[in-house]
């Protein structure tokens, strides 16, 4: 998501944002740390091994430096969900070559769950290798134009044309590939306004992208349509689709289940309700954060990309 900025940019960003009053001064260093972590993950992507988990006969979870990917193989060709960071493309292609059930069928289809570059950074490289990119229309719009990452107060340039989805949809698109049916469905704005889920029916696999950060407080992109309420509604949609055997793929973190997603929903709802009550009572963002609305969850959820205070601030601002 932030791979085109360097470490010095991030340090300057945190200082400038705090000085300008764009974010509470106490959160500036934490915001900078989040950005630095994302940049480092991108830089390390070429050297980060991809872990493979077999989800079904011909469906695999691929986990590397960026967002979680899913690969379906078979006689109709490969279907890959998300493309990690650009430097990861050689490793991704190597894994696909190893797992592919029918190399003669060609590279196949790449589906983006949303627009952030830890999920779309490999688009251009995989497109050059022959993949056709599918996504919700807003993903093409955001990849093809300059964007602002509001939390980090930074503008990002448009991605190269080769990274743009060639086939887009507004609400839903259905595919039949390799003996299974795949639904691609647009969530209402949630983590961003580009989020979709991909449901692979026979395999009982549901990829929900960054609607779920499994084991961590989520990042919500408030500048591109994200909100706490939207994330909660999207999680509820996913829960309605899943059964106790569904393999639910989060954008980040380990393979999930319906029970795990239910716990995530409970956390989101509890923090939202507390922050909403503080805000309704007249608390400023800094005052609401100081009341520690996430405290009961911090031991489990507070060690990831988003600090408890950063997450509480996002909740406050997107209510």
Predicted feature locations:
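N-terminal secretory signal peptides and thylakoid transit peptides that target proteins
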Residues: 1-18
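Active-site neighborhood of phospho(di)ester-bond hydrolases with catalytic His/Asp-centered motifs
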Residues: 81-83, 108-115, 134-137, 207-209, ...
């Amino acid at each position: 998501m932030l791979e085109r900025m360097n470490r010095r940019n991030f340090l300057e960003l945190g200082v400038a944002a705090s000085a300008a009053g764009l974010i509470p001064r106490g959160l500036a260093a934490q915001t900078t740390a989040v950005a630095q972590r994302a940049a480092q993950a991108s830089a390390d992507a070429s050297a980060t091994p991809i872990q493979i988990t077999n989800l079904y006969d011909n469906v695999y979870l691929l986990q590397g430096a960026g967002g979680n990917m899913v690969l379906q193989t078979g006689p109709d060709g490969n279907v890959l969900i998300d493309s990690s960071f650009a430097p990861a493309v050689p490793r991704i292609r190597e894994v696909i070559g190893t797992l592919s059930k029918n190399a003669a069928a060609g590279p196949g289809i790449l589906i983006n769950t949303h627009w952030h570059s830890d999920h779309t950074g490999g688009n251009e490289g995989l497109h050059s290798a022959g993949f056709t990119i599918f996504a919700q229309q807003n993903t093409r719009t955001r990849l093809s134009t300059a964007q602002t990452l509001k939390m980090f107060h930074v503008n990002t340039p448009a991605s190269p044309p080769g990274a743009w989805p060639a086939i887009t949809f507004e609400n839903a698109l259905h595919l039949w590939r390799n003996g299974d049916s795949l639904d691609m469905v647009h969530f209402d704005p949630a983590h961003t306004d580009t989020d979709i889920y991909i449901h692979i029916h026979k395999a009982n696999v549901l990829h929900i992208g960054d609607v779920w950060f499994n084991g961590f407080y989520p990042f919500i992109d408030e500048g591109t349509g994200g909100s706490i309420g939207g994330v909660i509604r999207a999680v509820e949609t996913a829960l309605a689709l899943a059964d106790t055997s569904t393999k639910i793929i989060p954008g980040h973190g380990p393979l999930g289940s319906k029970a795990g997603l239910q716990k995530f929903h409970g956390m989101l709802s509890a923090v939202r309700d507390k922050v909403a009550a503080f805000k309704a009572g007249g608390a400023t963002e800094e005052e609401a954060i100081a009341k520690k609305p996430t405290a009961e969850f911090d031991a489990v959820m507070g060690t990831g990309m988003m600090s408890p205070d950063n997450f509480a601030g996002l909740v406050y601002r997107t209510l």
